[in-house]
Amino acid sequence: SIPCGESCVYIPCITTIVGCSCKDKVCYKN
């Protein structure tokens, strides 16, 4: 998984629009 440079501790990943998802409080792209 590649880190997307976004955390998802308090708010969801905005980067989900480019295929990222929340894992361990950080957004990753599979």
Swiss-Prot record:
Covalent crosslink: Cyclopeptide (Ser-Asn): 1-30
Q: What keywords tag this UniProt record?
A: Disulfide bond, Knottin, Plant defense
Q: In which tissues is it expressed?
A: Expressed in pod but not in flower, stem, shoot, leaf, seed, root and nodule (at protein level).
Q: What highest taxon heads this organism's lineage?
A: Eukaryota
The record's section on Pfam families has: Cyclotide (PF03784)
Regarding how it is modified after translation, the entry says: Contains 3 disulfide bonds.
Single biological process term from Gene Ontology: defense response
Here the disulfide bonds are 4-20, 8-22, 13-27
Similarity comment text for this entry: Belongs to the cyclotide family. Bracelet subfamily.
The record's domain comment reads: The presence of a 'disulfide through disulfide knot' structurally defines this protein as a knottin.
What exactly does this protein do?
Probably participates in a plant defense mechanism.
Q: Tell me the protein's name.
A: Cliotide T6
Q: Which species does this protein come from?
A: Clitoria ternatea
Lineage, opening ranks: Eukaryota, Viridiplantae, Streptophyta, Embryophyta, Tracheophyta
